[in-house]
Curated annotation (Swiss-Prot):
One of its GO terms (cellular component) is chloroplast. Its EC number is 2.7.7.6. It is an enzyme of class 2 (transferase). Belongs to the RNA polymerase beta chain family. It comes from Nicotiana tabacum (Common tobacco). This is DNA-directed RNA polymerase subunit beta. One of its GO terms (molecular function) is DNA-directed RNA polymerase activity. GO terms for biological process: DNA-templated transcription. It is found in: Plastid, Chloroplast.
Length: 1070
């Protein structure tokens, strides 16, 4: 971890560090703060007092391991114990016990929590920081209206505004406003104190009318006036102490609580010296805010930029968990209070153990992790996805914005994001700009602000000092951006460098620079930092790339990228996908599922992950990397995980690519591939699907798991064992029974078949009254059974049913319809798989693996893929791997092109292949048509880029419908694969059919296959008897629906069918 004042070269911080620090802060500080707030509870007669002794709380080590929690669908949590005392005031006796108040879910080494067997992660939220903010708006006359908005700690807003006559009003709700003099008087000041504490007393006196003097003549009158406006009550309220307490509680304490951060911001903005423990709005704050508002009216002071990061705060894991803990303690307080009163009423002797229950705390955290918008299921598609998910920042959530109401200005990039929030990595769609990602070196400061590190440049000292600066501090410094010293301190700096000062980007002399960047990747997130040559790409395509890398499927045979950025190893290390040695030792035993490490006189067993399913059905598997007998150092890699090779992230494959059109099969971003990628398992991936069934205890008896299922073919039951569960290693097809289950049911006498009634009457044989409710393999689920789990919950009641889970492994080769993508936003769908002999081939005889469309490069402006493509070819011929930092043009102009050309030239020399680098068209080569053997007319760019296979696979998306459910209102087929829905024929599809004149097909689409109820019923019968399908004689249901909707608007629409019989054409001869 980097701290202030570190000397020398920095290291990249742990990518999960933000989550770890937040949870540790909650355990160390948040728990204690909330426990100290727990009040002393007395009964109604004030004879018994209950209190908690915070100093002695303890968290117990979990009884189960992480793996067992996932396996048994339990929560990986720690039990919280606190000392509590019960004091009898009459006798001064005290009974003290250590009580269990609930379970707190713990964070594991990945920065996630396991709740009910599911990995969940808490997202950091960006909120407007509490304090006061001044802005200016134009009214309908074009005159500036100045407003000061006071934001409380929980997000409530109150406004101060100044009108054209320099009168100041306080707006406590959208509709009601009162004079600031009334508000100040209600808060306890008289007129003399108000005028003594403001800078412009004459302005306050100028709008003081006789009516106003009467309102503020006494504190009681001011409170009544304010209460009438604030509570919006009619009539004349009467002053009382209860009214005063209610106003104090509802407004001055709840609505205007600034909190620790708000008090600090208010003091800084208004130059106040109020102590930090005064977290509520005071009369001094109101008067100082009014003074500043008057100054703005007369051209003094500055307005606030609400989108600047200095005016934002991060609501981290610690804050969210602490809020939930406080909520649970409030519920616990109500429970204890009610239990004490009940015990006294029934003349029972309470004990601390009897008064406290663990339900409030446990249920509060379970509902938080299960229902809160900022608690999400961890995306585990690949190792990169796990890290990036924990570093997200969201403007959404409770107290934040919504995708529908957020403006463009909020979504846009701000200069204060520099080095703190990645300008590239955000979601696409309605949440663009609202969900961001932390920059690599950013950290959350003590006051909830995002801090970024810089090197301080000082003429006095030769050493280098690192500073972490908040957004409000670094705007006062000249910050040099992207200079060469970020990597090599020995290079002599240029005379003029680009710099940032007060949210402006300037070009200044090196002597004027105060701070400089510490790393070229400092401004980007992890996803964007893994894109080589990102400086040559359009930002929109880089955004797509950083999102698509998270969708890459781990392949069965992973491969390191030839061209990378150098962060691949750190990303793999922090993802938790690797097995790392925790200490030195010697490997004494290895197996597919564990490693035994001997050292310090004992043996450490390190379990490996074997064919574990992620929540995106991808396969997580660790492969051994150390032989038996090898000596291991601490931190050494013992096993590679999914999508890692040699400890580096490996999401895709280096394949030979040509950029050229090919018979139209790669138009509109389609991709043509060679069958070699299929037969040699280049892009083969494993996927694990989970199928589960539960056995309940019904009112007719318990459900039974068995292999004796009547009325089912023996072929469907062939894979079941004697218990009725599918056997491990079985190959199952669609429709096979995975778990045989019978459910008892009550059958009426009249519903028996005749032969069943005869058997009962003559022989007295009891006919089975069970129905089969087996778990069957759905369509597209064929594969190999790799695991079966029978989870039996304690108790075995109907509320805790037994669960049987079957895991099936599928091997998926790449096929037509799958989605592939590069690292530069170049994505496409496989359109055709060609035989190797038909693919274009190079001058050395090698056939190309993929053919991309060259028209996808110029308009998208992602030229980085061309640099990567050519450099990858050179690296494959020279057997080299390149790790290139972004913005290499800071060393010299055209640095990227010079590097690529020099490597291609060297590859051409070493391999004696002049076609690798031809001076007439460098980077291109003449290639041949595999079908004819003739060369193509133009030279073509060929290379070896890194191509990913994405999770969007055709096996999960392909769907067909013959018949199914219809919507109740429109009578049209439902939408979506999950609902067995139909294919929508929209407006543009109808135009296309009209353009080709296919009238009968169009009529079928709009009637029989859609919402013509009578016609679609007749289709089946006429098809069976072989007759012609009759034409529909009335309007479809959607048209009738339109007519009914028009009738609701008092518009009558009559319609009739025009046929050949009653349709006459009167035509006159010319």
């Amino acid at each position: 971890m980097l701290g202030d004042g570190n000397e020398g070269i920095s290291t990249i911080p742990g990518f999960n560090q933000i989550q770890f620090e937040g949870f540790c802060r909650f355990i160390d500080q948040g728990l204690t703060e909330e426990l100290y707030k727990f009040p002393k509870i007395e009964d109604t007669d004030q004879e018994i007092e209950f209190q908690l002794f915070v100093e002695t709380y303890q968290l117990v080590e979990p009884l189960i391991k992480e793996r067992d929690a996932v396996y048994e669908s339990l929560t990986y949590s720690s039990e919280l114990y606190v000392s509590a005392g019960l004091i009898w005031k009459n006798s001064r006796d005290m009974q003290e016990q250590t009580i269990f108040i609930g379970n707190i879910p713990l964070m594991n080494s990945l920065g996630t929590s396991i709740v009910n067997g599911i990995y969940r992660i808490v997202i950091n939220q960006i909120l407007q920081s509490p304090g006061i903010y001044y802005r200016s708006e134009l009214d309908h006359n074009g005159i500036s209206v100045y407003t000061g908005t006071i934001i409380s700690d929980w997000g409530g807003r109150s406004e101060l505004e100044i009108d054209r006559k320099a009168r100041i009003w306080a707006r406590v709700s959208r509709k009601q406003k009162i004079s600031i003099l009334v508000l100040s008087s209600a808060m306890g000041l008289n007129l003399r104190e108000i005028l003594e504490n403001v800078c412009y007393p004459e302005i306050f006196l100028s709008f003081l009318s006789d009516k106003e003097r009467k309102k503020i003549g006494s504190k009681e009158n001011a409170i009544l006036e304010f209460y009438q406006q604030f509570a919006c009550v009619g009539g004349d309220p009467v002053f009382s102490e209860s009214l005063c307490k209610e106003l104090q509680k509802k407004f001055f304490q709840q609505r205007c609580e600034l909190g620790r951060i708000g008090r600090r911001n208010m003091n800084r903005r208004l130059n106040l010296d109020i102590p930090q423990n005064n977290t509520f709005l005071l009369p001094r704050d109101i008067l100082a805010a009014a003074d500043h508002l008057i100054g703005l009216k007369f051209g003094m002071g500055a307005l606030d930029d609400m989108n600047h990061l200095k005016n934002k705060r991060i609501r981290s894991v610690a804050d969210l968990l602490q809020d939930q803990f406080g909520l649970a303690l409030v519920r616990l307080e109500n429970v204890v209070r009610g239990t004490i009163c009940g015990a006294i009423r029934h003349k029972l002797i309470p004990t601390p153990q009897n008064l406290v229950t663990s339900t409030p705390l446990t249920t509060t955290y379970e509902s938080f992790f299960g229902l809160h918008p900022l608690s999400q299921v961890l995306d585990r598609t690949n190792p990169l996805t796990q890290i990036v998910h924990g570093r997200k920042l969201s403007y959404l959530g409770p107290g934040g914005l919504t995708g529908r109401t957020a403006s463009f200005r909020i979504r846009d990039i701000h200069p204060s994001h520099y080095g703190r929030i990645c300008p590239i990595d955000t979601s696409e769609g309605i949440n663009v700009g609202l969900i961001g990602s932390l920059a690599i070196h950013a950290r959350i400061g003590h006051w909830g602000s995002l801090e970024s590190p810089f090197y301080e440049i000082s003429e006095r000292s030769t050493g280098v000092r690192m500073l972490y600066l908040s957004p409000g501090r670094d705007e006062y410094y000249m910050v040099a951006a992207g200079n060469s010293l970020a990597l090599n301190q020995d290079i002599q700096e240029e005379q003029v460098v680009p710099a940032r000062y007060r949210q402006e980007f300037l070009t200044i002399a090196w002597e004027q620079v105060h701070l400089r960047s510490i790393f070229p990747f400092q401004y980007f997130s992890i996803g964007a930092s893994l894109i080589p040559f990102i400086e040559h790409n359009d930002a929109n395509r880089a955004l797509m790339s950083s999102n698509m890398q998270r969708q890459a499927v781990p392949l069965s045979r992973s491969e390191k990228c030839i061209v990378g950025t150098g962060l691949e190893r750190q990303a793999a290390l922090d993802s938790g996908a690797l097995a790392i040695a925790e200490r030195e030792g010697r490997v004494v035993y290895t197996n597919t599922d564990k490693i035994l490490l001997a050292g310090n006189g004992d043996i450490l067993s390190i379990p490996l992950v074997i064919y574990q399913r992620s929540n995106k059905n991808t396969c997580m598997h660790q492969k051994l990397q150390v032989p038996r007998g090898k000596c291991i150092k601490k931190g050494q890699i013992l096993a590679d995980g999914a999508a890692t090779v040699g400890g580096e992230l490996a999401l895709g494959k280096n394949v030979l690519v040509a950029y050229m059109p090919w018979e139209g099969y790669n138009s509109e971003d389609a991709v043509l591939i060679s069958e070699r990628l299929v037969y040699e398992d280049i892009y083969t991936s494993f996927h694990i699907r989970k199928y589960e069934i539960q056995t309940h205890v019904t009112s007719q008896g318990p459900e039974k798991v068995t292999n004796e299922i009547p009325h089912l073919e023996a072929h469907l039951l062939r894979n079941l064992d004697k218990n009725g569960i599918v056997m491990l290693g079985s190959w199952v097809e669609t429709g096979d029974i995975l778990v045989g289950k019978l459910t008892p049911q009550v059958v009426k006498e009249s519903s028996y078949a005749p032969e069943d009634r005869l058997l009962r009457a003559i022989l007295g044989i009891q006919v089975s009254t069970s129905k089969e409710t087996c778990l069957k393999l759905p369509i597209g689920g064929r594969g190999r059974v790799i695991d079966v789990r029978w989870i039996q919950k304690r108790g075995g009641s109907s509320y805790n049913p037994e669960t049987i889970r079957v895991y099936i492994l599928q091997k998926r080769e790449i096929k037509v319809g799958d989605k592939v993508a590069g690292r530069h936003g170049n994505k496409g769908i496989i359109s055709k798989i060609l035989p190797r002999q038909d693919m274009p081939y190079l001058q050395d005889g090698r056939s190309v693996d993929m053919v991309f469309n060259p028209l996808g490069v110029p308009s998208r402006m992602n030229v980085g893929q061309i640099f990567e493509c050519s450099l990858g070819l050179a690296g494959s011929l020279l057997d080299r791997h390149y790790r290139i930092a972004p913005f290499d043009e800071r060393y010299e102009q055209e640095a990227s092109r010079k590097l690529v050309f020099s490597e291609l030239y060297e590859a051409s020399k070493q391999t004696a292949n002049p076609w690798v680098f031809e001076p007439e068209y460098p980077g291109k080569s003449r290639i041949f048509d595999g079908r004819t053997g003739n060369p193509f007319e133009q030279p073509v760019i060929i290379g070896k880029p890194y191509i990913l296979k994405l999770i969007h696979q055709v096996d999960d998306k392909i769907h067909g419908r013959s018949s199914g459910h219809y919507a109740l209102v429109t009578q049209q087929p439902l939408r979506g694969r999950a609902k067995q829905g139909g294919q929508r024929v929209g407006e543009m599809e109808v135009w296309a059919l009209e353009g080709f004149g296919v009238a009968h097909i169009l009529q079928e689409m709009l009637t029989y296959k859609s919402d013509h109820i009578r016609a679609r019923q007749e289709v089946l019968g006429t098809t069976i008897i072989g007759g012609t399908i009759p034409n529909p004689e009335d309007a479809p249901e959607s048209f009738r629906l339109l007519v009914r909707e028009l009738r609701s608007l008092a518009l009558e629409l009559n319609h009739f069918l025009v046929s050949e019989k009653n349709f006459q054409i009167n035509r006159k001869e010319a």
